[in-house]
Amino acid sequence: VLYDILDTPVSPELLPPKDGKIAQKTEDLVGPYELHDFFLYYMLRAGYEPDKIFRIAVQTFDGVYDREVILKWLKNFYRRFFMQQFKRSCLPDGPKVGTVAVSPRGDLRMSSDSCVRIWMDQVEKLS
């Protein structure tokens, strides 16, 4: 039973399986979780800009993901992080970053209408 649980992909959508197989794997849509965790940590905890996060990711994941794959998911990460902020905003908006968490209750205070353009411009220069 534990092996079945460990072999089950993470998918918060909880869609029922089709023909005994999971219909949607979130990681297929958003990218490898290990990359997203890496991007999130260095963006929020260290305050690094996209170009620095990209350089470190290329070194860290050398032999695991190539530059193009890392760049693809970095672009996706920034786009989704900003576009999905409204889902995390259940309290009044206000900027504040504490530790690596996106909860608006104590760690991340980010306006739900923040613009991703500044970050995406930096990421686009990496191509």
Where are the model-predicted features located?
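ATP/NTP-dependent adenylation/nucleotidyl-transfer catalytic domains that generate, transfer
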Residues: 1-127
